């Protein structure tokens, strides 16, 4: 079963699921529906939306689709690892341990520390790896040290 991570991991996950011949995927969400259980949510911090206080939700109706299945999590980018760590923690609340975390891009190396502490480092794979960039004083960019 493919689990897609909002926001851009959802279309990527849908494409992976379709390519694998799956008829559906499980989409995590950031907007709470009235039937969601707050116990199946986690705080979400992202470098693309800092300080916004989002939550990540797992629809309780999707738990039977995940129970006892091989699960792959799909996200667009893993950079600091905090978002994907929240995803893995959320799935653990539902009794789900993914066999792999797939990312379109692994950005920099900071994610390794976060996921290493959580014990998830060995499950991560990416299509490509790039450095993280920081802005120089002259307005240009350089790879983060």
Which residue ranges define each predicted feature?
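DG-centered beta-turn motif at the end of beta-strands
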Residues: 75-77, 81
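Glycine-rich SAM-binding Motif I of class I
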Residues: 10, 81, 85
């Amino acid at each position: 079963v493919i689990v897609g991570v909002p926001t851009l991991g959802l279309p990527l996950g849908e494409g992976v699921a379709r390519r694998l011949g799956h008829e559906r995927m499980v989409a995590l969400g950031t907007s709470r529906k009235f039937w969601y259980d707050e116990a199946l949510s986690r705080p979400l911090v992202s470098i693309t939306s800092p300080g916004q206080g989002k939550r990540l939700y797992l629809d309780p109706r999707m738990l039977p689709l995940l129970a006892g299945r091989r699960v792959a999590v799909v996200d667009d980018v893993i950079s600091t690892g905090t978002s994907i760590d929240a995803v893995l923690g959320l799935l653990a609340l539902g009794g789900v341990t993914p066999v792999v975390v797939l990312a379109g891009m692994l950005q920099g190396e900071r994610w390794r520390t976060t996921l290493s502490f959580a014990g998830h480092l060995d499950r991560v794979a990416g299509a490509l790896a790039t450095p993280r960039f920081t802005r120089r004083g002259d307005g240009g960019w350089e790879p983060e040290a």
